[in-house]
Amino acid sequence: MAFGAGGGGGGRRPFFRRRKSCPFSGENAPKIDYKDVKLLSRYVSERGKIVPSRITAVSAKKQRELAQAIKRSRFLGLLPYVIK
């Protein structure tokens, strides 16, 4: 008997993830600024890496701006490159 026979799935309903909107779009949205360390640190992982947009639900354009701001902030010494 093969394990893959029978369709798998177990008769469960398909899971549809709700599409999250970009936190930087719309009114009252925070402005991406390299000096705003508190905002930028929310988009940096515990290891110091920039969190991808598929996890944070940031749009592609704003993700590029965010990455540029994080890199600029690191260069100026406001954010660490590596968190130990």
Swiss-Prot record:
Keywords: Ribonucleoprotein, Ribosomal protein, RNA-binding, rRNA-binding
Key word Protein transport present: no
One cellular component (GO) term of this entry: cytosolic small ribosomal subunit
UniProt-listed PROSITE patterns: RIBOSOMAL_S18
One annotated GO biological process: translation
Lipid metabolism is among the record's keywords: no
GO MF, one example: structural constituent of ribosome
Description of how the protein assembles with itself and partners: Part of the 30S ribosomal subunit. Forms a tight heterodimer with protein bS6.
Annotated family: Belongs to the bacterial ribosomal protein bS18 family.
Task of the protein: Binds as a heterodimer with protein bS6 to the central domain of the 16S rRNA, where it helps stabilize the platform of the 30S subunit.
Protein name: Small ribosomal subunit protein bS18
